[in-house]
From Swiss-Prot:
Its main location: cytoplasm. GO terms for cellular component: cytosol. One of its GO terms (molecular function) is protein methylthiotransferase activity. InterPro entries: Elp3/MiaA/NifB-like_rSAM, Methylthiotransferase, Methylthiotransferase_CS, Methylthiotransferase_N, Methylthiotransferase_N_sf, NA-bd_OB-fold, Ribosomal_uS12_MeSTrfase_RimO, rSAM. The keyword Ligase does not apply. Belongs to the methylthiotransferase family. RimO subfamily. HAMAP family: MTTase_RimO. Pfam families: Radical_SAM (PF04055), TRAM_2 (PF18693), UPF0004 (PF00919). [4Fe-4S] cluster 1 binds at C30, C66, C95. One of its GO terms (biological process) is tRNA modification. This is Ribosomal protein uS12 methylthiotransferase RimO.
């Protein structure tokens, strides 16, 4: 889609340099943008560019921006300005790049602007700004994923709306978890959202490509996979669920088929951005069987049928029945969701309906945001704007209920023994190294949910970041758990552990 990529006037090519060049990188926005950053970094490394850890010594900087809500736009513009001040050579990519006039108005000296998911375009600008002899670096391209059928020497490049890309082998997350993006773009027309305008309609990856990426990650030591898309439950719709090869079998591009195969690999598999479609029941059954983590991240947004209709959101009036059915299938299911309060037209009656839904559904993890206009969103034109002070008052009331429910639900876990994946150490100065740990249960995603604060006890110094331990929960508060390690079982995935992304 040519119209989706806008660039400034191309700079004249400098003379070829055989020395390696250093590129700084700033990644902003959601996990889906993080995966785009990983793809760009993978290609930079493959072509022989060094990634600078700071502005100092960077020959140019790439800024992967967010352009969704106003604060994110401002953060992106500020980051671009900071990078320009530091290096003078900045390539802008990501969602805000789909609105180049906004960038050029503030920063006319940027070297180039591309849209989102534009690896090839970004790399073209990097080569123009910082040409190097790439002949010596062809061996750094990603090699075949372990488990590929005989005769396949390199992973297939996948088509995107801006060209084709490799699945990333450079990760920006800690080694023990990774985001796996199964689709780009969105087919929904939510009144408050502009993602389809920024990232286009949904484009799903073939199931084989996703599964080979997951296999390679687990072979390299990744223990937790976060499956993401704008609408993960709609994965494969645009492909008409076509089949593709994985280890000699044909696998449909469908969420349930993908979940079955991912579950067979033995890692933690966590589902994000899931809409309550009927086939999600089958995924919940896999959760009950222990094949997929009993966790669903569902963006419900509201509970009033009137407001959901104004938002152009699906599922009005059926949300509670769906949640009850899922919990009957999998009693251990943890549900997280986000909501918007103060949407145009929201009355006190609508808000009370939302609060009652929260009481009835007793969601485990909840986030909420006051509505704010987003440039180009259809909701901006709706009548019945809610005053800012009313939005904030409703937000406070909403979060008070959500916090109480969270406190009650977490208190039910006290006394239980739970699996916890370790994310970091939390030692005091006088502690033996590895005495205090911070991790997450199967019901907690990194960065957005609660944590578990653990005392290692007899296992002090024996537990590493990324280990999965058994812990007895001894206390809780509004959002977090506290306990002690009682066992450190060996992790045994169903994927050969190579310690690197090499050929099996």
């Amino acid at each position: 889609m040519e119209d989706d990529v806008t660039t400034t006037e191309r700079l004249p090519a400098p003379p070829l340099d055989t020395a390696s060049k250093r590129v700084g990188f700033i990644s902003l926005g959601c996990p889906k943008a993080l995966v785009d950053s990983e793809r760009i970094l993978t290609q930079l490394r493959a072509e022989g560019y060094e990634v600078a850890p700071s502005y100092e010594g960077a020959d140019a900087v790439i800024v992967n921006t967010c352009g969704f809500i106003t604060p994110a736009v401002e953060e992106s513009l500020s980051a671009i300005g900071e990078a320009l001040d530091a290096t003078g050579k900045v390539i802008v990519t990501g969602c805000l790049g789909e609105r180049p006039e906004k960038i050029m108005e503030r920063h006319p000296k940027v070297a180039a602007i591309t849209g989102s998911e534009a690896v090839d375009d970004v790399m073209g600008h990097v080569r123009e700004l910082l040409p190097i002899d790439q002949g010596a670096f062809t061996g750094l391209l990603p090699v075949a994923a372990p488990g590929m059928r005989a005769g396949v020497e390199t992973p297939q490049r996948e088509n995107t709306r801006h060209g084709d890309v490799f699945a990333p082998s450079v990760k920006l997350t800690p080694r023990h978890y990774a985001y796996v993006k199964v689709a780009e773009g969105c087919n929904h027309t939510c009144a408050f959202c502009i993602i389809p305008k920024l990232r286009g309609l949904q484009v799903s990856r073939d199931a084989g490509a996703v599964l080979y990426e997951a296999y390679r990650l687990i072979a390299g030591g990744t223990k937790e996979l976060m499956i993401i898309a704008q609408d993960t439950s709609a994965y494969g719709v645009d492909l008409r669920y076509r089949e593709s090869e994985f280890q000699g079998e044909q696998v449909r591009a469908h969420l349930t088929d993908l979940a079955v195969k991912l579950g067979e690999m033995g890692a933690w598999v966590r589902m994000h951005y899931v809409y309550p479609y009927p086939h999600v029941d089958r995924v919940v059954e896999l959760m009950a069987q222990g094949k997929v983590l009993p966790y669903l991240d569902i963006p419900l947004q509201h509970a009033s049928p009137k407001i959901l209709k104004l938002m152009r959101r699906p599922g009005a009036g059926k949300q509670l029945d769906t949640i009850r059915r899922w919990r009957e299938i999998c009693p251990e299911l943890v549900i997280r969701s986000t909501f918007i309060v103060g949407f145009p037209g929201e009355t006190e009656e609508d808000f009370q309906e939302l609060l009652q839904f929260l009481e009835d559904a007793r969601l485990d993890r909840v986030g909420a945001f006051p509505y704010s206009d987003i440039e180009e969103a259809d909701a901006n034109a709706l009548p019945g704007a809610v005053p800012e002070e009313v939005k904030q008052e409703r937000l406070a009331r909403f979060m008070e209920v959500a916090q109480r429910i969270s406190t009650e639900k977490l208190s039910e876990k006290v006394g239980r023994v739970m699996d916890v994946i370790i994310d970091e150490f939390n030692d005091d100065e006088d502690d033996q190294p590895g005495t205090r740990l911070i991790g997450r249960t199967k019901g907690d995603a990194p960065g957005i949910d609660g944590q578990v604060y653990l005392y290692a006890g007899d296992f002090a110094g024996l537990v590493k970041i990324g280990d999965i331990v058994r812990a007895r929960i001894e206390d809780s508060d509004e959002y977090d758990l506290f306990g002690e390690v009682i066992e450190k079982p060996e992790w045994k995935p169903n994927v050969p552990q190579l310690g690197h992304f090499g050929k099996h």
